[in-house]
């Protein structure tokens, strides 16, 4: 607008021919924030000789780096960089023409201060328990409104009177604690400008150290190279620094002291007497310090100085010495490790061979007439009220060689190699040699004689080639304690002598069990088996039967009934077969009737019972058949009989009654006659759950659910069909009406359907004829008054056969539950379902 006015005035001057001087400034009033920059343009219309700027103090402005002047023809630009409060005021732009006439224009510059946070420190730290003042210096023009927020909530709204905003806008927290730690927001607002700014200040609460010393008293043993670790842990915030002091002096790590875990562990090494006393642990951080002391008590623990292994000879004398020191002087005890027997000063063993003698810190264990059982480990224990020390030694007893095995007699024969073992124990170990007479074995030209060592044994392997190899052999064992020898004899083995005491212990028509006693001599070689020869008296040929191993009992089978046999027994070893025993004669039993059969039974499937026949005495002739008679016990019915082939091992009784008791007699028959009957009684179980035991037995859950759904659908279909025929309603009737448009009831047969009198039979099926009647339609039987079926168009001309059941009162009735109706060749036949077999 001012620019247009200038051009307008310029036009007037040109038009009037006069050059009047006019000055304008682009802005008349400006608000500027401290630190911002701004420029102003002054335009002089006319013929200005100069254009100058004057500051609010009236001083002519000279261009500087911060306040800069730029002239462009009739324009002069004043630029103020980084304005401050002192720059506020009225600035004048003055133009001067050649005649010295001046014109000026002014601009008002207002400087305001934005929200300014000065020297805001974060984090700010305080000591727990003190009254804290969180400093936040904020200024602006006009003065700001300051608020504090903690966890996005103004502290003035927190229900804790420990928080308050002071007049200097600082936040006061009384009795500050660790839970007050966090980030606090100092927020300033200038309502006039809608200006807002904030600073987040981290508040840290320092907690003075608190020392935790799990153990304050320690015991240690001096001058034994031991070490002791003192533990000092401290809590606090920030983590405290731990230092150890001894006699007021700071402990530093060296050969004596080891510091670990940020000085939480002090290890005192190579403890000596002067290391005893107090050790002070001091913990320090910004919030303060804490200290506690631990006490190290140094003792001289028992220590065994002298204990060494000893060696002695069998039947000799030895003294075991144990010396120990300590403060107080320890007591010394001995323990024999092999049996745990303890020996103290003055003790003696029951046999008087072992005795303990002792004096100040020294104990001696005396053993006389040393036995091999005295060898082994001995423990010496030195103990006092402050501890103990234990060491072990070994008593080694040397002795001359001893032969372990008592077997000195061996048997073999020519061509049969044998090993003779010389088992020797000795301390120190012995050297073992085999000799025959004075010849050291093995010798030249004795390839059939070999020796080899296996552990402490020296094996002599002999493969006899002649009688000269049988005889005496000598095993000699030698160590520095002595020499021992033992003689071994190799005898020529023989076949066993004859068994004796042969007798028959069991006899039947076809088998015989014999027993006998072992022979008095096995010939020097173990018996392999026994051979039993058997033949008929009139026969020349012996049949050979071998025993199972060395059993002295043999069963002869496949014999002929009522026949006389001869038997003899011989023992067989590696050398061969021995002499036979004397011949024994026996006669098998004649063929006779079989013995009563042995049986046991169990319920079978359905209404049947299974009787199993165990193997029995058939009397010497095969069983031809079993005659089975059975009847119910409850009603004492007539006996029912069935026959089973003799080669069967079980009998099945069928068509029995549930929960009924039965009596059974079973007789076995062979070609000579019948056995005595075996009587057996049993009771049938109750009737099972048909659905559970038949339909669902072994089916999975899915199959059972499927069957249930199928059954439900079947019930719905049957119900709908019944409604169709009886009530002329239901889904099927609805479909029929829709398809046919009228009821299917015009025939005489439909009329009978409505009256419920017609019977229906499925084409080609074997399902029973089902007759429908109303309740009042009954025809009485002329004989017993029972209802009978009224003839109709579907009734067969022949009456069905009825099998009556007899009740206890003798009256014959027709039980509906026992009738099974079948259709065959257009004739209905009825029969009883539960027929007694």
From Swiss-Prot:
UniProt signal peptide: 1-19
Region of interest (Disordered), residue spans: 764-810
Positions carrying Phosphoserine: 765, 786
Domain Fibronectin type-III: 495-591, 593-688
InterPro entries: FN3_dom (IPR003961), FN3_sf (IPR036116), Ig-like_dom (IPR007110), Ig-like_dom_sf (IPR036179), Ig-like_fold (IPR013783), Ig_I-set (IPR013098), Ig_sub (IPR003599), Ig_sub2 (IPR003598)
Segments on the Extracellular side according to the record's topology features: 20-697
Residues modified to Phosphothreonine: 780
Entry keyword set: Cell adhesion, Cell membrane, Disulfide bond, Glycoprotein, GPI-anchor, Immunoglobulin domain, Lipoprotein, Membrane, Phosphoprotein, Repeat, Signal, Transmembrane, Transmembrane helix
A single Gene Ontology CC term: axon
Function: May play important roles in selective fasciculation and zone-to-zone projection of the primary olfactory axons.
Family matches, as PANTHER family: CTX-RELATED TYPE I TRANSMEMBRANE PROTEIN (PTHR12231), NEURAL CELL ADHESION MOLECULE 2 (PTHR12231:SF231)
The protein's name: Neural cell adhesion molecule 2
Species this chain originates from: Mus musculus
Lineage: Eukaryota, Metazoa, Chordata, Craniata, Vertebrata
Gene encoding the protein: Ncam2
């Amino acid at each position: 607008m001012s620019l247009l006015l200038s051009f307008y005035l310029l036009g007037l001057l040109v038009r009037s021919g006069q050059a009047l001087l006019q000055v304008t400034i682009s802005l008349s009033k400006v608000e500027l924030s401290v630190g911002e920059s701004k420029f102003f343009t002054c335009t002089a219309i006319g013929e200005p000789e100069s254009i100058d700027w004057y500051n609010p103090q009236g001083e002519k402005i000279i261009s500087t780096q911060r306040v800069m002047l730029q002239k462009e023809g009739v324009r002069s630009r004043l630029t103020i960089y980084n304005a401050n409060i002192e720059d506020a005021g009225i600035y004048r732009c003055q133009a001067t023409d050649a005649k010295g006439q001046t014109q000026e224009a002014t601009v008002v510059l207002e400087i305001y201060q934005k929200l300014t946070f000065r020297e805001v420190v974060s984090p700010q730290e305080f000591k727990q328990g003190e009254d804290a003042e969180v400093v936040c210096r904020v200024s602006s023009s006009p003065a700001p409104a300051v608020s504090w927020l903690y966890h996005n909530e103004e502290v003035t709204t927190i229900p804790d009177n420990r928080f308050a905003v002071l007049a200097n806008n600082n936040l006061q927290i009384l009795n500050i604690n660790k839970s007050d730690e966090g980030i606090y927001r100092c927020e300033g607002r200038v309502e006039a400008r809608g200006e807002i700014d904030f600073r987040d200040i981290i508040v840290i609460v320092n907690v003075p150290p608190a020392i935790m010393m799990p153990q304050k008293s320690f015991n240690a043993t001096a001058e034994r190279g031991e070490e002791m670790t003192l533990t000092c842990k401290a809590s606090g915030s920030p983590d405290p620094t731990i230092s150890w002091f001894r006699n007021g002096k700071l402990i530093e790590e060296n050969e004596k002291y080891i510091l670990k875990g940020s000085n939480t562990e002090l290890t005192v090494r190579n403890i000596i007497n002067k290391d005893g006393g107090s050790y002070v642990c001091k913990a320090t951080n910004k919030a303060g310090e804490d200290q506690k002391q631990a006490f190290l008590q140094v003792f001289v623990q028992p220590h065994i100085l002298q204990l060494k292994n000893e060696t002695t000879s069998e039947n000799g004398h030895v003294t075991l010495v144990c010396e120990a020191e300590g403060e107080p002087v320890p007591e010394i005890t001995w323990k024999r490790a092999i049996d745990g027997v303890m020996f103290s000063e003055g003790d003696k063993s029951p046999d008087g061979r072992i005795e303990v003698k002792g004096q100040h810190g020294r104990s001696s264990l005396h053993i006389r007439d040393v036995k091999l059982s005295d060898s082994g480990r001995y423990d010496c224990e030195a103990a006092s009220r402050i501890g103990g020390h234990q060491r072990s030694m070994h008593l080694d007893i040397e002795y001359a060689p001893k032969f372990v095995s008592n077997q000195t007699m061996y048997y073999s024969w020519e061509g049969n190699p044998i090993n003779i073992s010389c088992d020797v124990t000795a301390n120190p170990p012995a050297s073992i040699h085999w000799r025959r007479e004075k010849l050291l074995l093995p010798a030249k030209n004795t390839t059939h004689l070999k020796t080899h060592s296996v552990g402490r044994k020296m094996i002599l392997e002999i493969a006899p080639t002649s009688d000269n190899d049988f005889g005496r052999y000598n095993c000699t064992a030698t160590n520095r304690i002595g020499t021992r020898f033992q003689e071994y004899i190799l005898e020529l083995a023989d076949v066993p002598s004859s068994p004796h005491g042969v007798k028959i212990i069991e006899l039947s028509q076809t088998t015989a069990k014999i027993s006998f006693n072992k022979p008095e001599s096995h010939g020097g070689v173990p018996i392999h088996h026994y051979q039993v020869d058997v033949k008929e008296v009139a026969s020349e040929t012996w049949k050979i039967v071998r025993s199972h191993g060395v059993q002295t009992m043999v069963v002869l089978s496949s014999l002929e009934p009522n026949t006389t046999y001869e038997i003899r027994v011989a023992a067989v070893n590696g050398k061969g077969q021995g002499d036979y025993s004397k011949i024994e004669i026996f006669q098998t039993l004649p063929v006779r009737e079989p013995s009563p059969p042995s049986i046991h039974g169990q319920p079978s499937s359905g209404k049947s019972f299974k009787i199993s026949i165990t193997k029995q005495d058939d009397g010497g002739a095969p069983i031809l058949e079993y005659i089975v008679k059975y009847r119910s016990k409850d009603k004492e019915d007539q006996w029912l009989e069935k026959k089973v082939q003799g080669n069967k091992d079980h009998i099945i009784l069928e068509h029995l009654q549930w929960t009924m008791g039965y009596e059974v007699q079973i007789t076995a028959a062979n070609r000579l006659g019948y056995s005595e009957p075996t009587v057996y009684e049993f009771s049938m179980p109750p009737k099972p759950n048909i659905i559970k035991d038949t339909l669902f037995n072994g089916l999975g859950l899915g199959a059972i659910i499927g069957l249930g759904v199928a059954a439900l659908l079947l019930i719905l279909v049957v119900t709908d069909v019944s409604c169709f025929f009886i009530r002329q309603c239901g889904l099927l009737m609805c479909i029929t009406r829709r398809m046919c448009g009228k009821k299917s009831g015009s025939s005489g047969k439909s009329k009978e359907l409505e009256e419920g009198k017609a019977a229906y039979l499925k084409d080609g099926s074997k399902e029973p004829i089902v007759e429908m009647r109303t309740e009042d339609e009954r025809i009485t039987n002329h004989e017993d008054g029972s209802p009978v079926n009224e003839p109709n168009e579907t009734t067969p001309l022949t009456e069905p056969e009825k099998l009556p059941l007899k009740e206890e009162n003798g009256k014959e009735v027709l039980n509906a539950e026992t009738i099974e109706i079948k259709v065959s060749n257009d004739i209905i036949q009825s029969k009883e379902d539960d027929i007694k077999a």
